[in-house]
Design a protein with these regions (language model features):
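Charged, often Cys/His-bearing segments associated with DNA-binding zinc-finger transcription factors
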Residues: 1-51, 55, 477-500
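Trp/Phe/Arg-rich N-terminal binding region typifying the photolyase-homology
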Residues: 60-72, 85-133, 145
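Acidic, metal-coordinating catalytic cores used for nucleic-acid/nucleotide bond scission
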Residues: 66-70, 380-389, 407-408
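Active-site- or DNA-interface-adjacent structural scaffold in DNA-acting proteins
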Residues: 108, 112-316
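Basic, amphipathic alpha-helical segments enriched in Lys/Arg and hydrophobic/aromatic residues
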Residues: 279-286, 299, 420-500
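Electropositive, glycine- and tryptophan-enriched low-complexity nucleic-acid-binding patches
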Residues: 318, 326-372
Length: 500
């Protein structure tokens, strides 16, 4: 049984519209909760969001029968809080069980002893999909535009840029990736054998240490700084020998894992869980086979491995090696994300870029943003988004395209880029860096979720969270100004000075 929100209040429960926040607080939690309060108290917005959540998360779940699950509202609140605070599920678990104001937002009163389990939070927040979050984001941005008193006829002026969201991986080398693959292959196989009462892998911990020992030996052979030709040649032969030993040990255990899987398969897989286990182990074995081949080609045969063949994490295979040329940041491991922000500091659209460059997503970003917000007619970019096709295509979509060209400019291009409207929009473009910094502070520095689907969900939730936080910040400032006016109006001395 899952409902959008419990209609019957309990003793001690505070209505969400009546929740009060400390105006002196400078923490992030009150502002994002103020934004969530706005979402809940705006009846048309709340109804539309609940309809989306109900249709995507629990379309066939009974609302009257069965064990109660987390409400749709609580799922959304927990997801937003996790991203806004850039925290893991352990901290979220602590907050939802012991933070009084947050529990009021979740619908729990002072006498309500309901608590949430760690796995409950993890399973339910993961039900949010990127497509669902994108639909909710459109509703939130439209409500935000009403809040800032945007005229229905007012045009939207966008600014577009990309940045890297890192995946949670260690720095990759071919030999440590091979160790990762061997460690998981041996460990998972040993656990399975232990459950089946098979003694093939009684010494699995020693086996893993042996693989690691040979890997460390191969790593240490790289550290020689000898300059004598004979010593260099000798060190090179020792390096090759150490790597060959490492490969031989890895291959021997890889063969043993394969034999064990064959034995278990011949005995018969009992259920679907066993099939999933077998597929998982075979996946790590495939990673190990690839790394053995690449190490052999690079170290022993002296071949340069093409970049397209390299994998930078066996746990997050979608990870890319990105070098944007930033000072002090030679390389970033993750995926690029492109965002488009309007003049009111709301993020209209975003895109996760897989094996794509800025100029390849320029047109799609504008087209998709205009589908969601037809009033968008101006957009600025940096030079990385430039191409001849983009210059032509964007002029069909927008009234003003602020896309600086690369290289020497023609006379016509110079006139375009020196126009007053172009210069004004280009100067305002740097404000998008503030949005990027806000996203990185509130979750998008490193993705904590697993897999490409988890990555997309994490980014979409961060964008929605940022827009809700923006609404909360606007309301927070309005509340402060309102209280300041009340205070001035109530003070007779101030009134007399103003009258004078």
């Amino acid at each position: 049984m899952r409902v959008a929100q419990n209609e019957q209040m309990t003793i001690g429960e505070v209505d969400i519209s009546k929740i009060r926040f400390d105006p002196k607080s400078r923490d992030d939690i009150p502002k994002v909760l103020r934004g969530l309060q706005f979402v809940y108290t705006n009846l048309p917005l709340r109804t539309s969001i609940f309809e989306l959540l109900d249709a995507k998360i629990s379309p066939k779940v009974s609302k009257t029968n069965g064990r109660p699950g987390m409400t749709l509202w609580n799922i959304l609140v927990c997801g937003v809080i996790r991203l806004d605070l850039n925290c893991d599920y352990d901290r979220l678990h602590e907050l939802v069980n012991h933070h009084n104001t947050l529990r009021e937002m979740l619908g729990h009163g002072a006498f309500d002893e309901v608590t949430y389990h760690f796995q409950t939070l993890k399973d339910n927040v993961s039900l949010l999909t990127p497509e669902l979050l994108d639909d909710i984001n459109i509703l939130v941005v439209n409500a935000g535009h009403v809040l800032v008193k945007k005229s229905p006829d007012e045009a939207l002026r966008g600014r577009c840029d990309s940045f890297v969201v890192e995946t949670h991986v260690h720095f990759p080398t071919d030999i440590n990736l091979l160790f990762d693959a061997m460690r998981k292959s041996i460990t998972l196989t040993a656990q399975w054998c232990e459950e089946l009462r098979m003694s093939d892998w009684r010494q699995w911990a020693y086996n893993v240490r042996q693989v690691k020992r040979t890997m460390r030996t191969a790593q240490n052979k790289k550290r020689s700084k000898a300059k004598d030709e004979k010593q260099v040649a000798k060190n090179q032969s020792l390096l090759i020998e150490a790597h060959q030993t490492y490969l031989n040990v890895a291959q021997s255990y890889l063969d043993k894992v394969g034999q064990t899987l064959t034995t278990i398969t011949e005995q018969g897989l009992s259920d679907a869980i066993d099939l999933v286990r077998k597929i998982e182990i075979e996946g790590f074995m495939a990673h190990a086979v690839r790394q053995i081949d690449q190490i052999k080609r690079r170290v022993i045969q002296g071949e340069d491995i093409p970049h397209a063949e390299k994998v930078f994490s066996i746990f997050q295979p979608h990870t890319e090696w990105i070098s944007k040329g930033k000072a002090g940041v030679p390389v970033e491991l993750g995926l690029k994300v492109c965002i488009l922000e309007d003049q009111h500091q709301f993020i209209l659209h975003h895109m996760v870029m897989q094996q794509q460059t800025d100029d390849q997503v320029t047109q799609e970003m504008v087209i998709e943003a205009k589908k969601r917000f037809p009033k968008l007619n101006v957009c600025s970019f940096d030079k990385g988004f430039h191409s001849k096709d983009n210059q032509v295509a964007l002029k069909e979509q927008l009234e003003l395209v602020v896309l600086p060209r690369k290289g020497k400019l023609s006379k016509q291009a110079q006139e375009e880029e020196q126009a007053q409207a172009f210069v004004k929009a280009r100067r305002a473009h740097s404000s998008v860096e503030s949005a990027i910094n806000g996203l990185e502070v509130h979750g998008l520095d490193v993705c904590r979720d697993h897999g490409i689907e988890g990555f997309k969900r994490y980014v979409a939730l961060a964008v929605l969270t940022r827009n809700i936080h923006r609404i909360g910040a606007i309301l927070w400032q309005q509340d402060i100004e309102r209280e300041h006016r009340k205070k001035n109006h109530a003070d007779p001395d101030i009134r007399r000075r103003l009258a004078a």
